[in-house]
Amino acid sequence: MSEALANMPGDDYFRQPPVFDTYAEHRAYLKFRHAVALRHFARLGFDQDGLAGLITVADPEHADTYWANPLAHPFSTITPADLIRVDGDSAETVEGQRRVNIAAFNIHAEIHRARPDVQAVIHLHTVYGRAFSAFARKLPPLTQDACPFFEDHEVFDDFTGLVLAKDDGRRIAKQLRGHKAILLKNHGLVTVGETLDAAAWWFTLLDTCCHVQLLADAAGKPEEIPAEVARLTGRQLGSHLLGWNSYQPLHEAALARDPDLATMEPALPS
């Protein structure tokens, strides 16, 4: 097993997230990627549930404020200029003209507060994520793609309606602990990432894994990957750098589909 890890390419094999000299440059980059991620999820049909669905990204300069997609704005038309910056304590908009989905934000703000390592939190109402969450069980290591979540996700099994109290958000954040994802019983999926791109990849992948699991369970009794192998594969594929890199083709495909958004891309540091 140690040889399998030793044979993995080092970090220098992969593309690296950019580093910025100024807060303004970093903020422009994050807001653009934020809008592109929402367009990506729109293509997957993850924006078809009315007011539901939120991506928050920590502002690089202003502590405890988060960029968010505004309530009731379609993902498929969003631009960086549409995003709002929201105070983590009051949930008031401090930059922009719209309001945030307060129930979703109560989850996100508490996760950000409990996990300062997390740049982004994603919670969307997907068909397969909601269906699998109804079983209130962890995702088994059924395929290679599920292994990044092996021993790296949790289940919150206390659905009590809309998350309108901060304490409910705190309980979810506490249950998440240091993991990259949590399944909310009867509700859906939440993923986090040290980068927005990693969080977006984990969310895309987790929903796909839920779909695969539901299909396999319906067909019979699938054979899971042994724990030792699942643990190794998770270490091989589950890093945030791998998550960031895995998302890059999806980001680039979203830009190719939406040339209007591509024209808004800020210049990267040289």
UniProtKB/Swiss-Prot annotation:
InterPro entries named in the record: Aldolase-II_Adducin_sf (IPR051017), Aldolase_II/adducin_N (IPR001303), Aldolase_II/adducin_N_sf (IPR036409)
GO MF annotation, one: lyase activity
Top-level taxon: Bacteria
A Pfam family reported for this protein in Swiss-Prot or TrEMBL: Aldolase_II
One GO biological process term: antibiotic biosynthetic process
Keyword Glycoprotein included in the entry's annotation: no
Entry's EC annotation: 4.1.-.-
Keywords, alphabetical: Antibiotic biosynthesis, Lyase
Pathway per the UniProt entry: Antibiotic biosynthesis; novobiocin biosynthesis
Keyword hit for Coiled coil: no
GO cellular component: cytoskeleton
Function: May mediate the 2 consecutive oxidative decarboxylation steps in the biosynthesis of the prenylated hydroxybenzoic acid moiety of novobiocin, an aminocoumarin family antibiotic that targets bacterial DNA gyrases.
Similarity section: Belongs to the aldolase class II family.
Protein's UniProt name: Decarboxylase NovR
Organismal lineage: Bacteria, Bacillati, Actinomycetota, Actinomycetes, Kitasatosporales
